[in-house]
């Protein structure tokens, strides 16, 4: 992994250890996606986090909120000292699931928690910006398991029907529900719903950047979708092999072990 991919994972591990909470497998599967969006793709800056013309990032798979804080720390919106000192504490703004009401200055765009709600929220933002004729683009990160929710497919129908080519749905396809529900070919399903779809390696930052740029350049009144092929716990051998890390925070000894694995990856 490149240095920034390692740093983001190290910081996510540290924050999880500090608050003794977090879904680290899910976090590690999407960190590269979130970083590429903020660093290479989105029209967004910490200094203008409330600008009307900004791009929006909606995290629908809220269990991966610990993937968002390290990225926003790197982009200068938060400090590691502030986040690590308060994350997960009672009434803290740094919740394990995002809470936009605690960030009046911007930076967090949605409340997360109930799965299947981020996409309809993102569709509403994209539709409003389309009506206002704003240049804003909306990106929404969803887990593959969220497509068990009917709200996801209802939102896809609406997005295609309203010709929201300012919307990009990103599916973190880490195959977390395959043992329970066969999701089939997600690319074919989304294409049938009227999306322009591309599949890519969700851990290859160059490939992600190219895919996002190619889709954004297409103005054809069709919403976009990226199927990002990912691995749960990517960057840590222990987390990829042991599903207990879906929802487990490291103690001091485990933190050292996992950080060493990330550094060696």
PLM features per residue range, with description:
Residues 5-21, 172-173:
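N-terminal capping segment at the start of a domain
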Residues 55-57, 136-140, 167, 220-228:
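Generic beta-sheet signal
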Residues 134, 182-211, 263:
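Conserved thiamine diphosphate
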Residues 15, 27-161:
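Cofactor-binding active-site loop characterized by glycine-rich and histidine/acidic residues
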Residues 69-71, 151-153, 179-183, 235-241:
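Short acidic, glycine/serine/threonine-rich loops at helix termini
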Residues 205, 211-265:
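Glycine/aspartate-rich loop-and-adjacent alpha/beta segment that forms the canonical ThDP
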Residues 149-174, 223-228:
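A short alpha/beta connector and helix-capping loop motif
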Residues 109, 161-189:
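A short, conserved beta-to-alpha structural element at the edge of catalytic cores
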């Amino acid at each position: 992994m490149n240095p920034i991919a390692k740093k983001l994972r190290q910081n996510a591990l540290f924050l999880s250890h500090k608050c003794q909470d977090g879904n680290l497998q899910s976090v590690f599967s999407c960190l590269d996606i979130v970083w590429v969006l903020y660093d290479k793709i989105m029209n967004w800056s910490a200094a203008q986090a409330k600008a009307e013309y900004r791009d929006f990032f909606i995290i629908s798979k809220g269990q991966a909120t610990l993937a968002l804080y390290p990225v926003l720390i790197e982009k200068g919106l938060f400090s590691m000292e502030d986040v690590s000192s308060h994350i997960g504490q009672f009434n803290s703004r740094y919740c394990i699931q995002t809470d936009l009401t605690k960030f009046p200055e911007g930076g967090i765009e949605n409340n997360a928690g109930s799965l299947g709600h981020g996409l309809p929220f993102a569709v509403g933002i994209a539709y409003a910006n389309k009506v206002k004729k704003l240049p804003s683009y909306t990106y929404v990160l969803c887990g593959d398991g969220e497509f068990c929710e009917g709200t996801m497919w209802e939102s896809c129908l609406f997005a295609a029907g309203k010709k929201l080519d300012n919307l990009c749905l990103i599916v973190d396809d880490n195959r977390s529900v395959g043992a329970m529900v066969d999701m089939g070919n997600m690319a074919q399903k989304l294409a049938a719903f009227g999306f322009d779809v591309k599949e890519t390696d969700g851990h290859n930052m160059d490939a992600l950047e190219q895919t996002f740029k190619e889709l954004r350049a297409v103005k054809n009144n069709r919403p976009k979708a990226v199927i990002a092929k990912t691995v749960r716990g990517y960057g840590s051998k222990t987390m990829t092999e042991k599903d207990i890390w879906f929802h487990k925070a490291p103690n001091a000894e485990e933190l050292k072990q996992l950080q060493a694995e990330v550094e060696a990856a």
